[in-house]
Amino acid sequence: MSRFFAGGSDSDDSSSDEDLYGSGSESGSDFSQDEQDGGDDNDDDMSDDSMFADDSDDDSDDDEDLGGKGASYFLKSSTVADSDDEEDTGKKTVLSAKDKLLAELANCSKLIDNGKRINDWVLIQGEFDKLNKAMERFTKQRHGLPPKVYIQCIVELEEFLNTQLEDKAGIKKMNASNSRAFNTVKQRVRKNNKEYEAAIAKYSSGGDVAEEEEEENKEDKPKPRAKDEFVLTAPSQASNEEFTTVGKAGKALVSPTDMFKTLKTVLESRGKKNTDREDQVRQLENLLPSASTVYQKISVYTMLVSTRLDLSSASAALAPENWLKVVGDLNDLLSILEENIDTYHVIETAPEIEDVEKGPVAREDGVKLIPGSVASLVERVDDEFTKALQFMDPHTTEYVDRLRDETKLYQTLLRVQMYIEHVSDEKDTLGLARILVRRVDHLYFKPNNVINMTEQIAWGGVKGDSKATPRPTEKDLTSSTYPTTLISNMCSVLYKQSNTVFRTKAMLAHVYHYALNDEYYKARDMFLMSHLQSSIASAEPQLQVLFNRTLVQLGLCAFRSGLIAEAQQSLQEVCSSPRLKELLGQGLAKYAQAGVVDKQRVLPFHTHINLELLECVFLCSSLLMEIPFMAAHNTSIDAKKKVISKLFRRMLDYHERQVFCGPPENTRDHIMQAAKALQRGDWEAARDLVCAIKIWSLLPNPEAIKAMLTDKLQIEGLRTYLFTYWNHYSTLSLSTLADMFQLPVKDVAAIVAKMIAQEELPGSLDQKTNSVVFTQAVQQTKLQQLAVALSDKVIQLAERNERLVAGGYQFDKMTQPQKRKTQRAR
């Protein structure tokens, strides 16, 4: 460190270089403190700490001869400098970094004393924090042991605190802010003073380590000569201990003791209020160049990743640049672990390390176990990525750019999985299951070609192989069956776990993937055999959302396969609910006051199921089911009570009540007008309206879907026509029906025969004439139906009154408690 001083004499009796360091380090703090307190009883300490330490009589005489402009004059601390002298001389005092820190410590100590006089604990708390930060910088710059001004301040503060604790009446009289500050200072002082127990004990006994260290080297240092007004003095070899050893790029190297002390400090301050997390990250980043051993690097990287993740909050995700740094640090940690996989293992079940600085003791096989969890780190990184997508506008390019980072995350998950497989016990598969369930979450909803591409990128940057999910070949990555095999392998491991959450999530994801690939019967059988319908109501909200998504995807799969009835049954419960978005994890309730936890349950946008497509499929399925059913029960008095889809019936009734119906504008209008056309038997108009819906382009094979819908509309149009107009015919030719609905005669005959067999249509088939002969039954008018219903109700009422008059015949079968209850009610 450079020292500037000015001298007006060539005398050799000037202060030595050690005197300069000593007076600069202690004078600005101790002298001002002693002067504030009215002096110190210990004359030796006063002489050592004072700026104006008395030298020999000869030295003082020389200084007097030079008019008080010797070297010691220009080393006055800024806190005690005489402004009049500075104005007279016009000289500027240049302070070193150490002098400035000591001056700052002295200033904080003075303000703390002022706060003690007026009992202002808010001021004391603020200045105490500043004091500790200055002391932290003092330690980092390796200026030596804690100075006396700092030790004296914390000792006196603790004594004053103990005195205040005895005055309980005064504590009760404090206001809220002062009381909170008092409790905070009490906790911090006790915790802080434990770190300086040795220095405090030495101070209490009357000594000072910092002064003794300087006194040892004081005699060996030559006194500098002042040749000019300002002279740069080169430090001697004896003062090398006060300089910091630096590495590459001039960065200071930290000793192992200081390194693990910093790690301990960061660990203890995590999760506390008023903690500067960014400063903690900077501290850990500064430790990386000093980490020379593998154990030190692992310790620093593990703490650095966790601390970076703490930069996020509950209501905001981690910034993209910080998230990328976390992924980079985690990959660096994995690289170190993979390179030293035969000597170091980071596992959760590792025993606690007795000597943190020396590291863990090696086992018989030479492996050293470090307590930690790589799986937990990558889980938090995955959660931060999901949170970022949740709180981001999905309709911007930023969302797409952020989504590209998923491949980096997936590759990191794969590396962690391979590491856990190597270091963990074969019987302990919990850590492996935690990673596999994350991989399943990233893959189960994606098409096969996207899964193949993701696997190709992930395995391209990873060496080695995996037992649970072997490395795919080039042929596998171009196959459409590899994604199904991959998900089956991962789910098979999850099925063996004792944790029901893992098993349930694996089952639902497996069913979802089968349904997405149009394997309806496999998905349906697996879904029914799981018996999740009976227990899902008590599951976690996230599992309930996944259950609803799987059920909806099963219905979409049935619709694509042409199974209209199965599709309608699967979609009925979810699509009829007004909380559709909330049930699928794609939004919140309309008028609900959602908190942060509720918002985090919403899935990222790229995993959503298109709600417009879902509504279109459900309404089309209800159309093909409800219109023939309405036509079959049109003459029944209880026709309105027999409903397949209440939602569809309500929409249709609303559409019929409209005075004027314009051209269809949306999906719902197309389907409602198609329903009215189908009721008339005009299947062609219904087909044109349904096929005109643009949402079909989102399905994999839209033309095949439209062809399937055309066939279904022809069949259901034929059934609706027969249900509506059969009583107007005595016989009806099958060829005529075939021409009307453009169906083969064989198909028409099969449909009519099935309706007759199920007693839906009164009549019979005449094979000679190739026609259907209807049986004309007696048809009741609307008035007759109402009269019959009224007579039935009157008869029931009369019978009940007769039993009541007879003495309560209907109560004979009741139990005795029920009879007493009925009698009390009377």
Curated annotation (Swiss-Prot):
Gene Ontology biological process terms, A to Z: formation of cytoplasmic translation initiation complex; translational initiation
Subcellular location: Cytoplasm
GO molecular function: RNA binding; translation initiation factor activity; translation initiation factor binding
Intrachain disulfide bonds: none
Alphabetically ordered keywords of this record: Cytoplasm, Initiation factor, Protein biosynthesis
Start-end of Basic and acidic residues biased regions: 218-227
One Pfam family linked to the record: eIF-3c_N
SMART domains reported in the protein's UniProt record: PINT
Top-rank taxon, per record: Eukaryota
Residue ranges, compositional bias (Low complexity): 21-30
Biased composition regions of type Acidic residues, renumbered to the chain: 10-20, 32-65
Subunit comment: Component of the eukaryotic translation initiation factor 3 (eIF-3) complex.
PANTHER family named among the record's database cross-references: EUKARYOTIC TRANSLATION INITATION FACTOR 3, SUBUNIT 8 EIF3S8 -RELATED, EUKARYOTIC TRANSLATION INITIATION FACTOR 3 SUBUNIT C-RELATED
Role noted for this protein: Component of the eukaryotic translation initiation factor 3 (eIF-3) complex, which is involved in protein synthesis of a specialized repertoire of mRNAs and, together with other initiation factors, stimulates binding of mRNA and methionyl-tRNAi to the 40S ribosome. The eIF-3 complex specifically targets and initiates translation of a subset of mRNAs involved in cell proliferation.
Identification of the protein by name: Eukaryotic translation initiation factor 3 subunit C
Origin species: Yarrowia lipolytica (strain CLIB 122 / E 150)
Gene this protein is translated from: NIP1
